[in-house]
A protein has these predicted regions:
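Extended recognition/assembly regions associated with phosphoester-bond processing machinery
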Residues: 1-77, 82-235
Length: 235
């Protein structure tokens, strides 16, 4: 089993993985967010210098994690593809090959803002397309989180309080926390943001960037350093 930190979300045992994913063992389901396949190729086509091989290494990490967990379902919480330019043989060919070799794997994608611009993946890939608020057990699957401080949705409206609403799993923010040491030195680490009503996952992709956040009261951050997780909370 892939090492990580075991916690309860909505009274459900899950494991937070330093590989930037959440594992739900009872349902053999792996959650990731913000994969952004094809981002490097998109930037390169615009003449922007980018690291070579980012899409390949991201896909390799994702498939290796699926295999290590023996996942039956892979849920991507938005932004699988970065832009329409990602609909190329160079990007989709390796993805199609990996999925073809794993016919029993169910792959679900919650449409994110980049997916809206890129367009849905080809039907031949067999990826199930989901809209925001899709319910999976005790969880609601979203791309955008609610406002972490005020419990509001990304457009500024009050977050709905429904008696049947589940614990929201979301991405989009690419959250990272800055840890400061001596002599004003610091390091920025990707992190999970966990509170009573939602969990925000860090970006899975290798070439995605990150947004520095500050922990808000009542929230736990799980920072990722290499293959280790560190908890930052009120305790």
């Amino acid at each position: 089993m892939v090492p990580g930190i075991d916690r309860l979300l909505a009274a459900t045992p899950v494991r937070f993985l330093a590989a930037r994913a959440i594992w739900w063992p009872a349902q053999r389901t792996l959650f990731v967010a913000d994969v952004h396949l094809g981002k490097a190729e998109t930037f390169s086509a615009l003449g922007v210098p980018v690291p070579a091989g980012a899409t390949r290494s991201t896909l390799q990490r994702l498939i290796a994690l699926v295999d290590a967990c023996d996942a039956g379902t892979l849920v991507i919480l938005g932004d699988l593809l970065h832009a329409r330019a990602a609909h190329s043989d160079a990007v989709l060919g390796p993805l199609e090959s990996a999925l073809r070799r794993r016919p029993a794997l169910r792959v679900c994608l919650v449409r994110g803002n980049h997916d809206d611009r890129a367009g849905d993946p080809p039907e031949a890939l067999g990826i199930e397309m989901l809209d925001d608020a899709h319910r999976m057990g005790p969880f609601e699957l979203w791309h955008h989180p609610t406002d972490r401080e005020r419990g509001r949705d990304p457009l500024g409206a009050a977050a709905p309080e429904r008696p049947d609403s589940g614990h929201r799993l979301a991405g989009h923010l690419h959250p990272a926390v800055r840890l400061r040491g001596r002599a004003s030195q610091g390091v920025r680490l990707p992190c999970f943001c966990i509170c009573a009503h939602q969990t925000i996952l860090p970006a899975f992709g290798d070439f995605t960037g990150a947004a520095s956040i500050e922990r808000v009261p009542g929230e736990t951050l799980l920072a990722i350093a290499d293959d280790r997780l560190f908890e930052l909370s009120d305790r």
